[in-house]
């Protein structure tokens, strides 16, 4: 007989055993996995493993190689990493080639700052020496960012990334430009572009942001020209315009009106102002706006008559500066314009084609008719690249006493241009009124200083030129948008509206660090079309990089025998958006491990006007379609209160800090649980919420590992599995569909939420809780225990592989704990799900079982709260079920086991008054009762058969049988 007084029953239980730590220690542990993956060259192993699978390509939008990564970079790269990993684990060869955008102004600025600190003059430094320093700076930052991305567990070909400054890349970018030139899409023109005086360069729309500023606003009188106004009584009157840019008045060439607006002729009857209109003056306004304008100028008025659009179209005006500075003697025509409204102002728009896109378009639309009327259609250049007026602004430019006035100075401060123009308008008695206005105004995203619209000679790509097949670049791009999948769908509308309304594409920048516009032109601006010259350029760039264009003797080298023909070498460089828009050519097309077009591009929502946009135009212009099949967009990261992160506000969260304090997997979990396509929030409390969620997840994984330490790999036939195990396998089937669908649609939050809920609600609080008794206490030969181990094994494999793309460090740690000889969880595939696991009938039955169970657990929670019981095993409640479908669902089940009680009774009798109920489960009531019998010293269940086996008098018959079996195996 066994001496039971010497048995430590806890040592007879199959309790979880694992070295998987409860404390993650991610900041210390994660770098070890980074090192492991590096040493084993995991990326290369995955390529070899998947070489015969279909390719899936996410093309990396290149971050700028300048500075440490910020939270936006982390969000972006994590999303990309999850996509590439998930497709790899679903049977694809999912390559990821990281890239960097290397040219452009920010890097030039860094070198120029260094020069200024050293007292060097950039203009005295040979251009290729300057470019060399830019290249070195970009290279250094690529190294820094590479390590930062790896620390986030970004898996990619970091040994062979792409960069826009690579010699081959520069050659291909130049080649793409030459394709536009050869097809006639590239032209030199002059247009008003957004110009940064501070940076001395034109800016693309993507390089501009808007901030509120306070500006001068003026109302200006344009007299009706006397010699053409004799046929009606508008003679001697004036048309009044309103503008917030007084400095553009010297560039005025027309006044626009709208045939949709009602206008009138008004006479001033009283005036209380120090300057401006006097009684008797007659002025033309939009009827809707005259009262507001005259109130501003402290005037009383009366309406004389209506003025028709037809009448306005026949008159011309005098320039308000006529007679000043020996210029402005030309007439100012009236143009009918769709852009004119009577929402604000006067109903007339001051039109300076040198200084506004709509002004330019209105002027060019009428250029032919204006020339026929004897009006010079040429557009002046009133403001230079330094913000000073030129000779095209007589009286304000170099001919002005004291030198030219300036719009904006080198520091981005307002110059004296507004002041001197307003003074001259007052002197000429052409100022109607003046004031100040706070409004949104464009600023350079880099310098944060205001920009101006100024007419400049630039290189453009036509948006609306017939490309020989009846299409235009615009029509091709719009068609491509319709053929592209957008996530979220609103991105399609956004990009379409931008393409529909955009002007011709400005390609040129007047800077040094970039790929040159490598063409030669004659005096008229015609581009040299010579295949031999182009080949010499391309060959040189391939071997030496784009520096070859700026080397001494480059013109003669490339032109060869044509050097004496008078061709001029263009010195401008390409907009960096053309660089990044061309990345598909030297990555997707040129690399054998990739393919064109890409399956997906993923970037922030600002890239609808940036990389998505430029890539679309570049590819449609040279290949007729988009370089991508799908576009996924994410929002921006705000602080936890929804405010924009700012160093000045002290509310920034850096990925480096989160990783150092909590680990990269915490940051990745945050990304996975946000609505990333919208703006997200991040701060200390949100990070803590994710830490708490991670701990629960980790504990669930840890429990499974501990339980599976006793798993000998035995399988029970599906038909022999208990219902509870079959229910869990059914749930795995449902989750498998959800996970695969979620990864397909990039809906990561849906996956993360479903898996976390499954682990917390269905595993920890339900299945595992129920099965702990069988797993810990049943005999080694127990079918129930073997079935539970088998099911936990299936759950573990699926959960860890499903979560591996999201939490690569933690799932690798768990996988190697379970399978120490494995290469990596990231070399695994999502497991196929047997069709027999799906059982919708069983799931519906258990929906009812769990409903009844909720009423029981609710009743027992009250008993515990009132300290009538300490554990549910002390209870044997009576359950009254009036709904037959609910009682039928319990047939054949050990409902006490499911409720984790030592006993349970089910009755169809009427429930006694005071029985516990839940409002959402009709027809079920519970009366708590204490369990009968004695407490088993091993399982702690109360049974009436404790001591039935005299050799083990302290335990139940089930536990005694288990002990006998352990004894026979020599484990007792």
Curated annotation (Swiss-Prot):
Broad enzyme group: ligase
Placement of sequence motif 'KMSKS' region: 644-648
The protein, known as: Isoleucine--tRNA ligase
GO BP: isoleucyl-tRNA aminoacylation
Main location: cytoplasm
Keyword Cytoplasm: yes
One Gene Ontology CC term in the entry: cytosol
Family stated for the protein in its record: Belongs to the class-I aminoacyl-tRNA synthetase family. IleS type 1 subfamily.
EC annotation from Swiss-Prot or TrEMBL: 6.1.1.5
Record's subunit section: Monomer.
């Amino acid at each position: 007989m066994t001496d039971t007084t010497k048995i430590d029953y806890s040592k007879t239980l199959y309790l979880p055993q694992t070295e998987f730590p409860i404390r993650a220690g991610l900041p210390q542990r994660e770098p070890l996995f980074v090192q492991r993956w590096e040493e084993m060259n995991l990326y290369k192993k995955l390529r070899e493993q998947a070489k015969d699978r279909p390719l899936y390509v996410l093309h990396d939008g290149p971050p700028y190689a300048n500075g440490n990564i910020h939270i936006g970079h982390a969000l972006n790269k994590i999303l990309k990493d999850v996509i590439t990993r998930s497709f790899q684990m679903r049977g694809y060869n999912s390559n990821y080639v990281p890239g960097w955008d290397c040219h452009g102004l920010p890097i030039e600025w860094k070198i120029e700052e260094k020069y200024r600190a050293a007292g060097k003059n950039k203009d005295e430094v040979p251009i290729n020496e300057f470019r060399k320093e830019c290249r070195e700076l970009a290279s250094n930052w690529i190294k820094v960012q590479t390590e930062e991305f790896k620390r986030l567990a970004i898996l990619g070909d970091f040994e062979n990334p792409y960069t826009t400054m690579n010699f081959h890349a520069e050659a291909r970018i130049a080649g793409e430009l030459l394709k536009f030139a050869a097809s006639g899409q590239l032209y030199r023109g002059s247009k008003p572009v957004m110009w940064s005086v501070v940076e001395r360069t034109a800016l693309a729309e993507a390089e501009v942001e808007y901030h509120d500023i306070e500006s001068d606003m003026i109302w200006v009188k344009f007299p009706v020209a006397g010699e053409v106004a004799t046929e009606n009584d508008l003679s001697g009157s004036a048309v009044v315009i309103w503008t917030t840019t007084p400095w553009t008045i010297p560039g005025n060439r027309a006044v626009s009106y709208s045939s949709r607006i009602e206008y009138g002729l008004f006479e001033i009857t009283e005036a209380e102002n120090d300057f401006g209109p006097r009684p008797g003056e007659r002025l033309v306004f939009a009827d809707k706006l005259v009262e507001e304008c005259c109130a501003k100028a402290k005037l009383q008025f009366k309406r004389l008559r209506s003025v028709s659009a037809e009448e306005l179209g026949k008159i011309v005006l005098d320039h308000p500066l006529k007679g000043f500075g020996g210029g402005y003697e030309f007439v100012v025509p009236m143009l009918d314009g769709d852009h004119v409204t009577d929402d604000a102002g006067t109903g007339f728009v001051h039109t300076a084609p040198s200084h506004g896109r709509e002004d330019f378009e209105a002027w060019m639309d009428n250029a032919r008719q204006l020339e026929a009327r004897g009006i010079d259609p040429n557009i002046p250049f009133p403001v230079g690249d330094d913000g000073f007026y030129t000779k095209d602004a007589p009286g304000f430019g170099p001919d002005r006493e004291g030198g030219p006035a300036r719009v904006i100075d080198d520091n981005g401060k307002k110059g004296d241009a507004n002041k001197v123009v307003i003074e001259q308008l007052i002197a000429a008695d052409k100022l109607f009124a003046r004031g100040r206005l706070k409004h949104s105004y464009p600023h350079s995203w880099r310098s944060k200083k205001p920009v101006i619209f100024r007419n400049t000679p630039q290189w453009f790509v036509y948006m609306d030129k017939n490309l020989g097949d009846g299409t235009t670049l615009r029509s091709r791009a719009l068609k491509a948008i319709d053929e592209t999948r957008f996530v979220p769908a609103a991105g399609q509308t956004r990009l379409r509206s931008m393409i529909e309304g955009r002007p011709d594409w400005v390609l040129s920048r007047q800077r040094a660090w970039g790929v040159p516009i490598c063409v030669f032109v004659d005096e008229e601006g015609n581009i040299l079309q010579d295949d031999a010259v182009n080949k010499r350029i391309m060959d040189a760039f391939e071997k030496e990089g784009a520096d070859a264009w700026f080397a001494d003797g480059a013109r003669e080298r490339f032109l060869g025998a044509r050097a004496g023909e008078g061709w001029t070498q263009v010195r401008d460089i390409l907009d960096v958006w053309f660089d990044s828009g061309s990345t598909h050519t030297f990555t997707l097309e040129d690399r054998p491990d990739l393919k064109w077009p890409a399956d997906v591009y993923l970037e922030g929502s600002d890239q609808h006007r940036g990389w998505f946009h430029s890539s679309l135009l570049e590819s449609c212009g040279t290949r007729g379609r988009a370089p991508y099949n799908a576009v996924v967009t994410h929002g921006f990261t705000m602080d936890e209160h929804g405010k924009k992160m700012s160093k000045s506000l002290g509310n920034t969260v850096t990925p480096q800090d989160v990783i150092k304090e909590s680990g990269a997997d915490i940051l990745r979990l945050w990304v996975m649980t946000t609505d990333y396509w919208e703006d997200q929030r991040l701060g200390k409390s949100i990070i803590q919420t994710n830490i708490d969620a991670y701990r629960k997840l980790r504990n669930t994984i840890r429990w499974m590992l501990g339980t599976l330490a006793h798993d000998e790999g035995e399988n029970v036939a599906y038909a022999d599995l208990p219902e509870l195990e079959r229910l869990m396998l059914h749930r795995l089937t449902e989750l498998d569909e959800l996970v695969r669908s979620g990864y397909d649609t990039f809906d990561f939050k849906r996956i993360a939420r479903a898996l976390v809920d499954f682990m917390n609600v269905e595993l920890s609080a339900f299945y595992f809780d129920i099965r702990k008794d069988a797993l810990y206490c049943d005999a080694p030969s127990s079918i129930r225990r073997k079935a539970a181990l088998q099911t936990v094994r299936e759950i573990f494999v699926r959960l860890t592989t499903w979560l591996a793309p999201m939490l690569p460090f933690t799932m690798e740690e768990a996988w190697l704990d379970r399978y120490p000889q494995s290469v990596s969880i990231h070399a695994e595939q999502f497991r196929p799900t047997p069709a027999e696991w799906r059982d919708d009938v069983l799931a519906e039955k258990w929906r009812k079982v769990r409903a009844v169970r909720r009423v029981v657990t609710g009743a027992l929670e009250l008993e515990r709260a009132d300290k009538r019981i300490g554990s549910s095993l002390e209870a044997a409640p009576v359950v009254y079920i009036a709904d037959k479908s609910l009682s039928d669902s319990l047939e054949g089940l050990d409902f006490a086991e499911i409720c984790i009680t030592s006993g349970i009774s089910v009755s169809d009798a009427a429930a006694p008054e005071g029985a516990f109920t839940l409002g959402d489960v009709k027809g079920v009531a519970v009366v708590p009762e204490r369990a009968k019998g004695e407490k088993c010293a091993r399982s702690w269940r109360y049974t009436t058969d404790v001591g039935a086996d005299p050799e083990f008098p302290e335990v139940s018959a089930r536990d005694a049988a288990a002990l006998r079996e352990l004894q026979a195996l020599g484990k007792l």
